[in-house]
């Protein structure tokens, strides 16, 4: 047994996100249809307290179009972040979520994933943004809009 001491050190750092807008209306329609067809397969038992599909949706219509986009972008941002190291991106899971008013996602991380992403098919007026609790008093909320694809590090 090792005597392990935990120390919380004050750290000033940035949370880096990578964002781009996708203009894929036909893909979006397919994804929306599949999310509606699947309904809530997780029964609100995950961190997402809303309608959530299965975990591995990559073969479903629309999702199968999003996957190569996500893999390509993750490779590009990895080369930027990790100084041109050769990267072989892979997808562990991809799912869909549909929120109603008052439904939330509990703060969580996606460790051990290097990257996580969220893709907004639509963004109702006054919808809350994507929020990072790690930013505390600095805010940390990203305003969402239809077609916005946001990558962030999996440990946050």
Model-derived segments and spans:
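Non-heme Fe(II)/2-oxoglutarate
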Residues: 1-87, 104
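Catalytic core of non-heme Fe(II) oxygenases with the double-stranded beta-helix
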Residues: 88-156
